[in-house]
């Protein structure tokens, strides 16, 4: 449910020399393997205490390696589809939008937009890295000289303009957009970079790049939908695995560390977040996992996710620590489950984003818990954990094939407990909605 934002790949038969301009047509692109990736370490908590034998995590993917804790060590990332041809097609579409809207250039800094258009992932730093795209789909990556080898591997079909430590990268960018009167800039580009670009390009107008990239990224292509399916299946397996772990007597942080370990063992190359909210902590949707010890009788909200080759997972289930749940806990869980089902029933091609929120909210309102549903029903997901479309009142955007989003109603009773259920879903080509998460929605009991 909550996110910080990867994959990296490129296309080409040879490495492009620094400064060489390449006009890579879509027809010339060939499939190729290999991706440049970045990953962050999972949250580090206290190591879990010695535990009983842990069943092997279930999987449909063969594995040759098993960890000392009995978990399969494999990666669905090994069978993720190639992104290389897709990035060139996306640049062509972005260039068409530049022409339609009268922009002379698109400047994209490190982040999801850079990966989406170039297949290159690098973390933002004080050294400027910038993709420059013109209305004819001519692309150049301006990058520090020391990063040029990485760019060559990740995006060999894109020209490079490198700069040394004593050179001014803003002059290099300016030289590529001399004729551009209006420039679209990446939404998340650092303000310090934007100000220096404005100084290097006086008398130009600047606008945010979401006018170009938002519409493209909302509608996932087949490669992206498959990536989201695989990463969601990986998260499902992690959930099934955590149900076999002990809860009572252990801290939220220890259980969160288990979730991170399971996500990696089941194929994730990045752990984004592991919310473990037990007892009264469950009434805070974005609870910071703590050292509170889980007790018998607690209801526990588990909201976790990460990335596999850049594409994000996000799943929430609520469990109960005892053989049987209390009457109200079970009642609230049933209401939330019915609310999610109503959201699914409303989701289809042509439906407005707010109509899914209204459908889920109506169930909770009618059950008498309306004031305790305190957030929107869902958010888009892809290369970012939260992106358009947002399923919230007032958003009249219509759902279209390729749009992927969460459906995650919740009820939060202050000082007592909370319940949330979340899946990722996608609108298919035939206009129907398809869940990408398949893990059981039952109010599971754990030891």
What are these regions (language model features)?
Residues 3, 37-39, 53, 73, ...:
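N-terminal leader/targeting segments
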Residues 69-447:
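Active-site neighborhoods and metal-handling regions in enzymes and metal-associated proteins
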Residues 47-66:
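Short alpha-helix boundary/capping segments
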Residues 1-48, 69:
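Low-complexity, Ser/Pro/Gly/Ala/Val-rich intrinsically disordered tracts
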Residues 10, 14-17, 24, 28, ...:
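Exposed, low-complexity/repetitive linear segments and helix-based recognition motifs
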């Amino acid at each position: 449910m909550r996110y910080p934002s990867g994959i990296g790949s490129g296309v080409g038969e040879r490495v492009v020399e620094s400064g060489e301009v390449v006009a890579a047509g879509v027809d010339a692109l060939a499939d190729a393997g290999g991706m440049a990736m970045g990953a962050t370490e999972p949250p580090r908590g206290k190591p879990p205490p010695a535990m009983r034998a842990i069943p092997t995590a279930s999987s449909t993917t063969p594995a040759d390696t098993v960890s000392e804790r009995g978990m399969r060590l494999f990666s669905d990332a090994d069978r993720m589809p190639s992104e290389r041809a897709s990035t060139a097609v996306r640049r062509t579409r972005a260039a068409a939008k530049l022409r339609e809207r009268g922009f002379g250039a698109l400047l994209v800094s490190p982040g999801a937009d850079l990966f989406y258009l170039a297949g290159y992932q690098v973390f933002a730093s004080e050294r400027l890295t910038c993709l420059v795209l013109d209305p004819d789909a001519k692309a150049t990556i301006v990058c520090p000289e020391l990063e040029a080898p990485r760019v060559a591997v990740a995006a060999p079909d894109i020209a490079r303009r490198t700069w040394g430590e004593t050179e001014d990268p803003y002059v290099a960018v300016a030289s590529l957009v001399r004729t551009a009167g209006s420039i679209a800039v990446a939404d998340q580009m650092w303000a310090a970079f934007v100000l220096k670009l404005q100084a290097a390009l006086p008398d130009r107008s600047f606008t945010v790049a979401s006018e170009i990239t938002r519409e493209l990224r909302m509608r996932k292509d087949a490669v992206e939908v498959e990536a989201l399916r695989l990463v969601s299946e990986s998260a499902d397996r992690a959930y099934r695995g955590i149900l076999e772990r002990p809860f009572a007597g252990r801290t939220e942080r220890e259980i969160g560390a288990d979730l991170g370990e399971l996500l990696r063992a089941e194929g994730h190359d990045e752990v984004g977040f592991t919310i473990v909210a037990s007892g009264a902590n469950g009434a805070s949707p974005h609870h910071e996992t703590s050292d509170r010890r889980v007790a018998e009788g607690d209801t526990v909200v588990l909201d976790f996710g990460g990335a596999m080759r850049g594409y994000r997972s996000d799943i929430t289930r609520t469990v109960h620590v005892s053989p049987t749940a209390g009457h109200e806990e079970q009642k609230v869980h049933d209401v939330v489950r019915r609310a999610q089902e109503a959201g699914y029933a409303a989701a289809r091609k042509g439906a407005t984003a707010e109509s899914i929120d209204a459908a889920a909210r109506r169930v909770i309102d009618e059950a008498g818990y309306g004031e305790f549903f305190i957030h929107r029903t869902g958010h888009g997901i892809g290369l970012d954990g939260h992106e358009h479309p947002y399923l919230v009142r007032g958003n009249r955007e219509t759902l279209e094939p390729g749009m992927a989003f969460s459906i995650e109603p919740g009820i939060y009773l202050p000082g007592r407990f909370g319940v949330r259920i979340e899946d990722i879903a996608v609108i298919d080509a035939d206009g129907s909605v398809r869940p990408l998460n398949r893990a059981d929605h039952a109010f599971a009991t754990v030891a």
